[in-house]
């Protein structure tokens, strides 16, 4: 019997002359396109791949890397990865979607440093999402060259690359083309394996932790589903199958990912995330004036904008997305697609709706959609929607490249060229004005202080970038004109190359890197600020308006000298012990601000309240109540009742001062008095001078008990792990064991092996009642939501596997 395996090459055949066996179903043209996409990713990530540098900006060094180190510490202590003790009196670990605990790549953090790990994640996800865009374009009937261009425009687009420093959004965005492509295939073929593939893709996107990206994928998938609808009453049976197929894929995706979203939903239900005010949800909306950045490479956020301009355009902050640039040269191809094909016009209509949503508070659209679909109220920052616009723009560019191959539509092509000339002319005018009249242009929206350089220093580089983009777009327009002649199909290839190079040049260096040693550096202040005897540390946050920030004679976090490299600012923040980075070195923090909107409401109120009472005796009381033994700050005002420990130099204009808090309560202590109050009355009780957290506990219900003259007993910690605490209590009379840790109903407490009620104590912490005598109190974190989620995911996986095997896939 002859073998089906390919014959081995003759001995001695050089490697480069041997035929490479491609995977089944993969044509050589596809392999060439994927190879070219890999080359583009290499160019984008060259500093990381060739120089060993790492990404560091924004959420990466402030949240991702500390959280990754916290996860490693929790696992190393033999605990289940359910509770993170290092953030704000402790918080759920698995339930926090930004931890991405169920996303498979996350567990590689156990094998390497988080910054090295994330560099690999970026490279892998950029290539992965480029392949997904290629597959999606092919699903949408684009040719292989057109699909390659679509994938290249997507992976080099400003919005997608801007998400690199917003890690969970980046991972979620990488899955958007795959979710849309697999849903399109499932709806078209209605086969079990295609439904399973769509469900798995959706589940993996959900566990990346970005609800925003999941919502965007759902919107695009729903829009794509419309092309499979057969309109008319006689086609209702076919459309019924479409609905059934989509529902099965959605249910499978939700079932497989239930271990993530059920605990996350339980966590969010106790927070203020569902009650965000309109001003928070629509913060960082795309200003209509900044939409010009989508087709003209003007980095407005990096310019020295006047206070008025920055307030209007970026909420007086840095832009949420560093680049909105989608490509001026690609725009010529987008115009060609819209003018020449009906399918492209349908995609363009969805693109227009998406951009309208990105405008957020500047139009009623975002408010209308979130009102009609209440679950979407959990989403915030409409500018994120621009990543969906980038994908649609890329698909249109691919369609436009295909349109250039048609030579029978001269009138339409001339219409495209006329529109392109207008757009290119406007961009060229902006570039020329920036180069020749920087003072007049800069005076309109830039600021210049006495020692600042002239406006030309900021605007001339912008002019160069804009005029270079104009040159690329002009070349694409010329290629479109030449394509009208028969036999010039090569013009589409030339146009595609110019469109890709335009985006590569414009977004080059968008995500800055630094040597890995900067992220590994351990500031000397860490060991001094670490609280003794299991106490907590309170690190001051100067990004929020407080009395402490107002006491500084300069802007918050102002560097002492101009930085030689942007990464110096990150090093300075870490050296000054910015609150969120404490977890990287295993320092347990306290009173952190609720940046994600996922803290329990009571804890968020308590943390804000600490800032409100600065400079009063209540401030010290709250520090003592939270077992805070050390305070790290760069100011002195309001800390007269604290004891100075050390003063350390920083890269900022102020040194870092470490203070000791007098007489903080132990992490676990016994009290006899009970004060009963809830809500505003509880906050008032905390501030009452008669309430001493070392002798009494504040409970939301029950019977009040007068504070005894001395503690009703003693306690000793026997075992302390992140998810399990064992305490021995020797009680002379009944009392309460108070834990200076966040209350969460997932903590299961037993006294001598018998279940005991866990109380929310001191407004946001927790306590358990203990009778007289010697007792062992065991508190273990095992939330019901995690068990339920794991059970649903397990059942879904079993059902999915059974369907897969039954179909003989």
Label every model-predicted segment.
Residues 276, 282, 448, 497, ...:
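Extracytoplasmic
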Residues 64, 332, 356, 626, ...:
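Active-site-proximal, structured, solvent-exposed surfaces of multi-pass membrane proteins
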Residues 166-174, 182, 186-199, 203, ...:
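Contiguous transmembrane helix-bundle modules in multi-pass membrane proteins
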Residues 15-92, 265-272, 332, 518, ...:
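Hydrophobic alpha-helical membrane-insertion signals
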Residues 64-75, 79-81, 253-337, 378, ...:
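Periplasmic/ER-lumenal interhelical loops and adjacent helix-loop junctions
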Residues 38-131, 152-174, 280-326, 360-373, ...:
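Membrane-interface coil-to-helix junctions
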Residues 37, 130-140, 144-229, 245-264:
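Membrane-embedded helix bundles of polyisoprenyl
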Residues 1-46, 242-250, 335, 481-497, ...:
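Start-transfer (signal-anchor) and selected internal transmembrane alpha helices
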């Amino acid at each position: 019997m002859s073998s089906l395996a390919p014959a081995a090459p003759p001995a001695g055949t050089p490697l480069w002359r041997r035929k490479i066996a491609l995977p089944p179903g993969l044509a050589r043209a596809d392999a060439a396109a994927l190879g070219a996409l890999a080359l583009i990713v290499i160019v984008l990530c060259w500093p990381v791949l060739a120089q060993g540098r790492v990404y560091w900006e924004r959420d990466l060094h402030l949240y991702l890397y500390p959280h990754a180190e916290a996860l490693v510490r929790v696992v190393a202590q033999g605990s289940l990865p359910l509770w993170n003790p290092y953030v704000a009196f402790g918080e759920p670990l698995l339930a926090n979607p930004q931890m991405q605990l169920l996303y498979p790549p996350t567990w590689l953090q156990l094998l390497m440093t988080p910054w090295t790990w994330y560099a690999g994640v970026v490279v892998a996800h950029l290539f992965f999402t480029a392949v997904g865009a290629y597959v999606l374009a092919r699903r949408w009937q684009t040719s292989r060259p057109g699909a390659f261009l679509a994938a290249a425009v997507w992976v080099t687009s400003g919005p997608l690359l801007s998400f690199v420093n917003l890690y969970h959004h980046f991972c979620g965005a990488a899955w958007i083309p795959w979710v849309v492509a697999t849903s399109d295939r499932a709806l078209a073929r209605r086969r079990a394996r295609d439904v399973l593939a769509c469900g798995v893709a959706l589940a993996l996107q959900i566990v990346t932790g970005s609800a925003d990206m999941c919502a965007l994928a759902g919107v695009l998938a729903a829009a794509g589903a419309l092309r499979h609808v057969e309109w008319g009453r006689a086609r209702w049976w076919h459309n019924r199958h479409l609905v059934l197929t989509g529902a099965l894929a959605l249910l499978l995706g939700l079932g497989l990912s239930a271990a993530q979203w059920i605990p996350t939903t339980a966590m969010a239900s106790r927070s203020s995330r569902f009650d965000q005010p309109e001003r928070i949800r629509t913060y960082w909306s795309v200003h209509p004036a900044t939409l010009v950045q989508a087709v003209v490479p003007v980095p407005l956020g990096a310019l020295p904008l006047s206070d008025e301009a920055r307030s209007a355009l970026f909420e007086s902050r840095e832009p949420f997305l560093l680049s909105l640039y989608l490509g001026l040269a690609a725009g010529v191809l987008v115009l060609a697609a819209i003018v020449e094909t009906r399918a492209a016009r349908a995609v363009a209509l969805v693109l227009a709706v998406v951009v309208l949503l990105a405008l957020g508070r500047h139009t009623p659209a975002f408010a209308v959609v979130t009102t009609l679909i209440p679950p979407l109220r959990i989403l915030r920052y409409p500018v994120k929607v621009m990543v969906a616009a980038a994908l649609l723009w890329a698909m249109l560019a691919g369609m436009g490249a295909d349109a250039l191959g048609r030579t029978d539509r001269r009138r339409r092509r001339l219409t495209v060229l006329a529109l392109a000339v207008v757009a290119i002319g406007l961009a060229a005018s902006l570039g020329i004005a920036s180069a020749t009249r920087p003072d007049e242009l800069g005076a309109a929206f830039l600021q210049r202080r006495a020692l600042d350089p002239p406006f030309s220093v900021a605007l001339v580089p912008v002019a160069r970038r804009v005029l270079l983009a104009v040159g690329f777009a002009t070349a694409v327009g010329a290629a479109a004109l030449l394509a009208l002649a028969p036999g010039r199909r090569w013009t589409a290839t030339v146009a595609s190359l110019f469109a890709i190079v335009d985006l590569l040049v414009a977004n080059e260096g968008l995500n800055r890197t630094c040597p890995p040693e900067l992220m590994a550096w351990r500031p000397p202040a860490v060991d001094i600020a670490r609280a003794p005897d299991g106490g907590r540390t309170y690190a001051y946050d100067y990004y929020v308006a407080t009395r402490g920030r107002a006491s500084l004679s300069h802007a918050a976090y102002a560097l002492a000298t101009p930085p030689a490299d942007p990464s110096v600012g990150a090093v300075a923040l870490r050296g000054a012990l910015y609150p969120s980075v404490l977890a990287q070195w295993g320092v347990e923090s306290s009173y952190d601000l609720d940046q994600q909107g996922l803290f329990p409401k009571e804890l968020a109120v308590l943390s804000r309240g600490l800032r409100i009472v600065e400079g009063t005796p209540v401030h010290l009381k709250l520090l003592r109540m939270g077992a805070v033994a050390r305070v790290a700050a760069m100011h002195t005002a309001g800390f007269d009742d604290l004891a100075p420990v050390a003063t350390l130099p920083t890269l900022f204009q102020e040194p870092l001062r470490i203070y000791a808090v007098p007489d903080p309560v132990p992490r676990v202590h016994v009290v006899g008095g009970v004060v009963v109050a809830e809500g505003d009355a509880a906050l008032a009780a905390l501030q009452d001078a008669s309430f001493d957290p070392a002798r009494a506990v504040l409970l939301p219900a029950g019977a009040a008990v007068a504070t005894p003259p001395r503690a009703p007993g003693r306690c000793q910690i026997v075992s302390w792990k992140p998810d399990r605490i064992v305490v021995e209590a020797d009680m002379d009379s009944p009392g309460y064991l108070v834990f200076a840790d966040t209350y969460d109903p997932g903590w299961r407490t037993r006294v001598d092996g018998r279940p005991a009620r866990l109380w929310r104590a001191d407004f946001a912490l927790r306590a358990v009642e203990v009778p007289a005598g010697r007792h062992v109190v065991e508190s273990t974190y095992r939330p019901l939501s995690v068990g339920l989620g794991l059970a649903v995911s397990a059942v879904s996986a079993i059902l999915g596997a059974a369907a897969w095997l039954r179909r003989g896939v």
